[in-house]
């Protein structure tokens, strides 16, 4: 009886698809047969060549990048290729095609519409969420900002804290109109956060940014759900848009009671 149970367990384990074992939310698992056809279906593809069952900080960073990319654009495929140097040597020929160093995994490539046009992430660059975003931004017209951030808002809010009050009010009015045009609920929520911070900085001055950052960090460090942590992180990312190297504008005087 015990022998039968062990046999059934082994069969079940070997029947589990490898895509279940490799946890990378939003990633497509490619192999030698599907690689070229899949990459050619997208304007751009970021592909990570790695060991068959990756783990650790670099894999976690790539997974986080995948989540951010899916929120930001439909024109970018995020994929993985598991390379085995044992058994049937799965995908080893594909790794050899791109001169992947199996002693220095992972190797990350950005493909531009076909399997022969690509750029490799330099081996000296750390595999982090921010570096992967920068890699895509530097080599494509795509924008993958920090979670919560809106490209159009970021572009017009540079040095917002230092511009005259009248210009701040004009920007508030302008972005209020843009916020009303947004159809995605999450984007609408993020836009509301921008507008709240714009009004607060206009009313209180730059000190608000420092005080609000500390408050949100305290909340994030407390006992909150993962969903709440993600919400707080989005707000912190939006707040960073307003940060300036030097404050040149005098804060509004507080009214005496």
Curated annotation (Swiss-Prot):
<dbReference type="GO" id="GO:0012505">
    <property type="term" value="C:endomembrane system"/>
</dbReference>
<dbReference type="GO" id="GO:0040014">
    <property type="term" value="P:regulation of multicellular organism growth"/>
</dbReference>
<dbReference type="GO" id="GO:0009950">
    <property type="term" value="P:dorsal/ventral axis specification"/>
</dbReference>
<dbReference type="Pfam" id="PF07749">
    <property type="entry name" value="ERp29"/>
</dbReference>
<dbReference type="GO" id="GO:0042803">
    <property type="term" value="F:protein homodimerization activity"/>
</dbReference>
<dbReference type="InterPro" id="IPR036356">
    <property type="entry name" value="ERp29_C_sf"/>
</dbReference>
<feature type="short sequence motif" description="Prevents secretion from ER">
    <location>
        <begin position="254"/>
        <end position="257"/>
    </location>
</feature>
<dbReference type="InterPro" id="IPR012883">
    <property type="entry name" value="ERp29_N"/>
</dbReference>
<dbReference type="GO" id="GO:0007313">
    <property type="term" value="P:maternal specification of dorsal/ventral axis, oocyte, soma encoded"/>
</dbReference>
<dbReference type="GO" id="GO:0034975">
    <property type="term" value="P:protein folding in endoplasmic reticulum"/>
</dbReference>
<keyword id="KW-0143">Chaperone</keyword>
<dbReference type="GO" id="GO:0009306">
    <property type="term" value="P:protein secretion"/>
</dbReference>
<dbReference type="InterPro" id="IPR011679">
    <property type="entry name" value="ERp29_C"/>
</dbReference>
<feature type="signal peptide">
    <location>
        <begin position="1"/>
        <end position="21"/>
    </location>
</feature>
<comment type="subunit">
    <text>Homodimer. Interacts with pip; the interaction is direct and does not require pip to be folded.</text>
</comment>
<dbReference type="InterPro" id="IPR036249">
    <property type="entry name" value="Thioredoxin-like_sf"/>
</dbReference>
<dbReference type="Pfam" id="PF07912">
    <property type="entry name" value="ERp29_N"/>
</dbReference>
<feature type="region of interest" description="CXXC motif">
    <location>
        <begin position="24"/>
        <end position="27"/>
    </location>
</feature>
<dbReference type="GO" id="GO:0009792">
    <property type="term" value="P:embryo development ending in birth or egg hatching"/>
</dbReference>
<keyword id="KW-0217">Developmental protein</keyword>
<keyword id="KW-0256">Endoplasmic reticulum</keyword>
<dbReference type="InterPro" id="IPR016855">
    <property type="entry name" value="ERp29"/>
</dbReference>
<dbReference type="GO" id="GO:0005788">
    <property type="term" value="C:endoplasmic reticulum lumen"/>
</dbReference>
<comment type="function">
    <text>Probable chaperone protein involved in dorsoventral axis patterning in early embryos. Probably acts by folding and targeting pipe (pip) into the Golgi.</text>
</comment>
<dbReference type="GO" id="GO:0005783">
    <property type="term" value="C:endoplasmic reticulum"/>
</dbReference>
<keyword id="KW-0732">Signal</keyword>
<protein>
    <recommendedName>
        <fullName>Protein windbeutel</fullName>
    </recommendedName>
</protein>
